Amino acid sequence: WVRGEGYDPSLAPRGEFDAAWLDEIVPDRPVVLRAMDYHTAWVNTKALELAGITPETPQPLDGEILLRPDGTVLGTLREWGAWSMVYNLLPPLDNEQRHKAALAASAAFSSCGVTWAQDAWVEDDTLETWLLAAKSGALKFRANLAWFAEPEGVWKTKIDGFSKNRDRLAKEAPDLLT
């Protein structure tokens, strides 16, 4: 899998990105890119195939699979109901992969003068990454962390955990993480 985060969906007309554009670069491996708005994903044909997304796939209630004028799948998936069909197939990142990504992001942000950022999709495993980066001195900017809450209602069972994580941030890395 090739995965990426943070592309600007406004770079294509109507935010409609074509799987064929990714296929030209990576035709043999699934690619999934999450837009900076966290509401859109751009995927290649291989990812669509693995997810079983075809022109006959019913439109999800809480999402949209964009189609080309000829009825074929475009490669842009909007909202949870559509892009979760691909995201649920992604292999999990391990701690080392997440830590390397945090270091790369910190270096990139620092080189541009960024002093504050928000991560709008934090889960328990990524919390550990943020804390490690902050405690090790590798984090060179402040970050506001927002916990991911699944739209299907599972989030309601996680409210206590969200509160405990906030308390933990306040105790362990109050100068860098909020």
Segments the model singles out, each with a brief description of its role:
Residues R166-T178:
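Short, intrinsically disordered, charge-balanced linker/junction segments flanking boundaries
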Residues W1-R166:
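Divalent metal-binding segments
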